[in-house]
């Protein structure tokens, strides 16, 4: 164990916190193909805000590089690259394959490659390992080995950090499984769970987020029903929540790099073996349609107040996929922006957490620096940033015209302080 030198490949929201924790204990090389990312990390800056300068400094054994040759001294490679979906909602393994190609070029006999990226069951051994074999010329489970330990990072969550979240581990042989588990036990104070196989660990990860996606879909459907009945959904959920085993989910937009993406990995694999999943895809359709539903509700409310919709101005408060973090990946707030444009509504997006450069690069959106007072026909509270909560209803209302509609998607305000709630 003492001889293990770790390389963490991919230094985003998942890889960097992991590299920092290992860097407090042993030699670690953090690798990323983004040279700008490496430059900022070398300066002690993390633009994702997951790790602060003090934590980076504390990881005294951690170095950063974009040079693949610097990984030759490592014998354990942990892959933490994104696993997105394409425009057809099919798994896009390109980052994973490219990372495997790179590692294959520096892989040596006895080395171990551990994947943390969310995949469908079988991806590690069926998709990644052959790439490692091809580019290294080595044989799997003879010359090199594999492990899988799914990430459970929750971006922006300062309470549930890498070390305090229980970790599932696995390996391609019983001996490697034990070694992988021992390695993670060095940094995971919450403990580990050694799965019986890599496929079991892969499946466990993908159903964690699929289950959450379906639970939110159920609550979203209930919210639509209760809205038609004139019943406040939050009040219903509070009442139902008094029973000990009622699960406290809330309605809303389902975006981000995990919950709105991972179910498609599982359904893809299911379809490839001849099974068409009904419930999982139904939940995805419902959640993917929430942006359009929100806009339809807003437009109806505006029409009831005789607010002219064509050419109206709407302020969208929040663009990130979740509160109090700058992560824009797969944010479903963009669906609201696009749907409003279908009504020829002018949209201003305000989000103090977002880099204007990132918003333009990812979605072609230029956020406003400061919203104009008395300028908007509609205001949508789309993300529960602390800044918005601290503003209070009165200050938020001041941004609207004398006649406007305030739609609170996130229950940031008391029921009587907004005009619409999800």
UniProtKB/Swiss-Prot annotation:
GO terms for molecular function: NAD binding; oxidoreductase activity, acting on the CH-CH group of donors, NAD or NADP as acceptor; UDP-glucose 6-dehydrogenase activity. Its EC number is 1.1.1.136. This is UDP-N-acetyl-D-glucosamine 6-dehydrogenase. Pfam families: UDPG_MGDP_dh (PF00984), UDPG_MGDP_dh_C (PF03720), UDPG_MGDP_dh_N (PF03721). Activity is relatively constant over a wide temperature range from 37 to 56 degrees Celsius. Optimum temperature is between 37 and 42 degrees Celsius. Disulfide bonds: none annotated. Transmembrane segments: none annotated. Optimum pH is 8.5. It comes from Pseudomonas aeruginosa.
